[in-house]
Amino acid sequence: GGGGDPERTAKRLSSPLGKILRLDVSKSCGKKRYCVPSVNQYRTSKSKTKRLVFASGVRNPWRISVDSATGNLWVADVGQDAYEEVNVVSTGARGVNFGWSCKEGNAGFNSSQCAGLAGYVAPVTTLCHTEAVSGCTPPFVGESIIGGDVYRGRTAPTLGDRCRGQPPK
């Protein structure tokens, strides 16, 4: 989609843009080479795309990882002009909306796209762009976030908390 989501695809559930889609490729259902998981919020929708929507309101998710210990889904989402964000979909959550393009990070972005922001979940952390945000200082500075796997090993335990460098709880 275009910069700033001018066609509002991130909140339109019939569009795959601005979404995290979930499908089960370990089996086939009918003529499809995949199945729609029974836990998908919109699995009974008439819209083929909407059935697959697991989360909405993302701008450009740039790596997704499942935490093997909790089942939570960690999402690094590249922002538009001012913020990068790390989002988490908790195990069992349904219909999660991360707010794009009403919000960028925790800040407002386009207030005309805030109506009907059901299921909004704020990022667990944000990184600001130094040239775009007044007072933006390390350690939470970045230009294009890239996620990675959730690490829970013993060799480097401080890698267990991917946001703050603290050992996992």
Provide a role label for each language-model segment:
Residues 1-169:
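Beta-propeller domain segments
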